[in-house]
Amino acid sequence: MHVLRDYLGSLGEHTQMRPPVAFDFGVNTHIGKYCFFNFNTTFLDVAPITIGDYVFVGPGCQFLTPTHPINVQDRINFWEGALPITVGNNVWIGGGAIILGGVTIGENAVIGAGSVVTKDVPENTIVAGNPARVIRTIDPQQRPAHPHQYSEQEMTQAQEFYARLEADNF
């Protein structure tokens, strides 16, 4: 992670990325704290990509800011534009999702695996599909009685394990 800090626009504390990870430029990518990116994440950051805190990204996700013209002559001239991507806090993005330029994903949203997000996603919303469509809204107060199946000891062991990985610059 120390190497990434030198090349990215900004990288929050306790954020983890599982290799391989790819960036177009890196300097246009800004990632908050306590985020997790699984294997094979791609950031084509021709325009800024801004990701909030506590964002969890499944394997094989892509953040694609470039835009390309439909006009043949513009393509022949290698014209390329770009639109920014913004992801709010506490967002969960399922594996294989593609987030296109010009999209803002609101806080607490969930993006279904394999979705292609072409339009803004409101906060507290679950979207899925190609193109991604609203499945339902999330009540932030609604929470299962037992949010996870692990004991407090198991959670502590997992946190210590990930802290060791981070300390070893994994």
Name these PLM-found stretches.
Residues 104-106, 121:
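Extended beta-solenoid/beta-helix repeat architectures
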Residues 49, 123-125, 133:
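Glycine-centered loop/turn positions within well-structured domains
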Residues 21-31, 36-104, 137-139, 143-145:
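Flexible, glycine/small-residue-enriched loop-and-beta-strand segment within the central core
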Residues 1-14, 132-136, 140-170:
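Terminal amphipathic alpha-helical/low-complexity segments used for targeting or macromolecular assembly
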Residues 88, 92, 110-112, 116:
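A generic "structured core" feature
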Residues 13-18, 37:
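LRR N-terminal entry segment and analogous cap-like coil->beta motifs
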